[in-house]
Amino acid sequence: MPKTERRTFLLDFEKPLSELESRIHQIRDLAAENNVDVSEQIQQLEARADQLREEIFSTLTPAQRLQLARHPRRPSTLDYVQMMADEWFELHGDRGGSDDPALIGGVARFDGQPVMMLGHQKGRDTKDNVARNFGMPAPGGYRKAMRLMDHANRFGMPILTFIDTPGAWAGLEAEKLGQGEAIAFNLREMFSLDVPIICTVIGEGGSGGALGIGVGDRVLMLKNSVYTVATPEACAAILWKDAGKSEQAAAALKITAEDLKSLEIIDEIVPEPASCAHADPIGAAQLLKAAIQDNLQALLKLTPERRRELRYQRFRKIGVFLESS
């Protein structure tokens, strides 16, 4: 989608920058209509816009990062697939009677290499979000994902997963259909796959819903994505009986890419364009593609046995604790 369309939804902290950019466009249009040279003034305003952009996006709080991760115009799995893959053929169904639209996947050609690309898929508007259950997969979604990963393993195709979900569907029907079992099965099986697995958090990485496709040789995060055991709203409601304290919870949960890199939960932070992924989706896709290419080339040099061993050790070492003296 064009950048202008992605600017129609503004977060509060983006508004000063948007107003300045609108002013620059107005001056440029008026100057063109009246054949007036305002290049010096435009240059000064653009310098101010660059400075303001840096001030805004370099000092974001965890709660503001969460807003960006949930931005309705933020690129989705399908957006990245379309921008990064040379070819794409979607595969459907879990072979158990369902085809969950909240988790999509298919065979693609990435940088000349056949791969399996799969991930959570949110909607673009209310109707689409309802159809895709707001990116919250049912058990069938995780079983479909595992079927596709088994297929990739059988044919020697690397697996690229894209994580963007507030969590797995927590409805009664999901529990009846074995939500916990479906996610646990994926966790176990992903450790045993021979092919390289690269997982990227592109928006929200919520709880077990994220982990269900999140066991990889490399786990990447876009700079303004989040990865958390529970949404800050849920955490605040549980700890303080007040969902209004979500901002406090967001800070305590350590949900940002920088926090998770320091804790060695993730391997790499993928930078975003100056105005973030929702404002420049093509730029974001180029940066992500380069990061995946580098990691994939490194992983392809390892034997399957070595990849499995390192993958297992990577997750075994997660977590720290303090001992009293």
UniProtKB/Swiss-Prot annotation:
Where does the CoA carboxyltransferase C-terminal domain lie? 44-298
Query: What EC number is given for this enzyme?
Result: 2.1.3.15
Q: Where in the cell is it found?
A: Cytoplasm
Write the protein's name. Answer: Acetyl-coenzyme A carboxylase carboxyl transferase subunit alpha
Supply the source organism for this entry: Picosynechococcus sp. (strain ATCC 27264 / PCC 7002 / PR-6) (Agmenellum quadruplicatum)
Q: One of this protein's GO BP terms?
A: fatty acid biosynthetic process
Presence of keyword Lipid biosynthesis: yes
InterPro entries from the UniProt entry:
Acetyl_CoA_COase_a_su, ClpP/crotonase-like_dom_sf, COA_CT_C
Q: Name one GO cellular component term.
A: acetyl-CoA carboxylase complex
Q: Where are the transmembrane segments?
A: none
